[in-house]
Amino acid sequence: MKKNLFILCMIMFIAQSCCEKPILIGHRGSLLGVENTEEAFINGAKHFGYQGLECDVKTTLDGQCVCWHDDHLQRAGIEEVLIPEITLDSLLSLPLTQTRKDVTYTATICTVDRYLEICKEYNVFPVVELKWATGINNNDMTLFPSLYSLIEKHGLVEEAVILTSMRKSLEYIRTNCPQLQCLYLRQTVKDEDVQWCHDWKTNISIQHANINPELVNTCNELGVEGAAWTVNNDSTYQRLVDCGCACVTTDYLEVK
């Protein structure tokens, strides 16, 4: 049986001991490269040594899944282009440029297929965040089977984690693809959110400032595991260790 990496990284979330170091997940790959592109993903795994890599998913005009946060490409210096209105071939021809920490990077769009190939090659688990996209949203999941097929193609069904703020999408996945692990993305958390996660056998991803020992206890009582996002400084990291959080998403954190 394949090793379930995500369960291993989450198992200490509710623990009270602060001796264990949290597992790190590279946010949109890492800081080193245009976000959500091949260079950022490879650097997240190879340079930083993150155990997981997170990407965002959008769909093109011809129904292909690509890694990007928005419908537009403005954060990469391209105006008046919308991913849902362009084919994959046309999208791949566009040069993406982004300056991060005073370093300018160039890249092309990364397909989800290539992202999963990188995860497999570097033995990291994928955290696939579903943004509202054509065919993958609360009202329409007709393109999700093609995304699932990519995960299956790379032999990552047991390792992959699906992350989204869209409840109905998660309910669809839990109903139709119960072998996939899911994370409910939240900024703030109410008891009702944790109860919903318990009912749907779904875990939770929480903005780091809203994680505290009381919330950890609430999750513990209902058997819900969680993750923290997005942590980029040592003091926040240490506070989460003290809270008992074992899994955090980061752009560039390096923990010795």
Model feature map: region roles:
Residues 4-14:
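Sec-dependent N-terminal signal peptides
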Residues 17-256:
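Phosphate-group recognition and catalysis centered on beta-loop-alpha active-site segments
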